[in-house]
Amino acid sequence: CATGPLRPSIPIQRCLIMKRAVDIVIATLLSVLLILPALLVALAIKLDSRGPVLSRPHRVGRHGRMVKVWEFRTAIADPDAMETVGGCHGEQVTRVGALLRKLGIARWPLLWCVLNGDFSVVGPRAEMPRYVGVYPPALRKVVLSVKPGLVDLSSREAHAERALLAGLEGDALEEAYVEKVLPRRLELGKQYVEGRGFWMDLRILAGCLAGPLLR
């Protein structure tokens, strides 16, 4: 069922309840299926470098609420470093971390964010706080009216995004992300919010089967 307006009516609330139930089922099944591979990933991280297995970066959730998410640690970094699209300034990406980023495995622990209700399986991509600050006010209100997701309409353009940003560093990388990648993600996020529903979620999930689910 489509959700239509941003303010939930009784039918929309029923859709949201159904969506939450589907989120729990999918996240639970994937968590069970990935538990052994995840343990191997955790062991590889510990053997590769010192530090915790998981990192807790901040992301902006529904209605602008700040949430701390779970991801596999992929770098040795200053905990006070500023996070950007290219990573934290001064960070040193580990050998295992580089592979986890390339394969999209670093985001597997986000399944726990689905189970605890901060994320949905399908929803606009969660963004770093510094970039939410440049959202146009109208788009910000729309995109942040729903929970962020693991995958969305922009997931199918991930390869094109990586190609666009490949080889860029520092200010050039930041500029390309803010001026080219972010506006497209926001437009797709707006499309999702305005047309969201069971069938759209199903189409997005089906499209993600062509590549790694959590990339």
Question: Model-predicted segments: where are they?
Answer:
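Short, glycine-rich, amphipathic interfacial segments at transmembrane boundaries or analogous
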Residues: 55-92, 153-183
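Glycine-rich flexible loop motifs, especially short His-Gly-Gly/GGXG/HXGH segments used as catalytic or interaction
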Residues: 3-28, 56-57, 82, 87, ...
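Short, well-ordered beta-strand elements within core beta-sheets of diverse protein domains
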Residues: 96-103, 190-194
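Short, conserved beta-strand/loop elements in beta-sheet-dominated catalytic cores
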Residues: 98-120
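Positions in alpha-helical segments
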Residues: 27, 42, 55, 94-98, ...
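Residue-level signal for the nucleotide or nucleotide-sugar donor/cofactor binding architecture
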Residues: 91, 103-106, 197
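Hydrophobic structural segments characteristic of membrane proteins
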Residues: 112-215
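A hydrophobic, helix-centered structural microdomain
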Residues: 12-77, 192-215
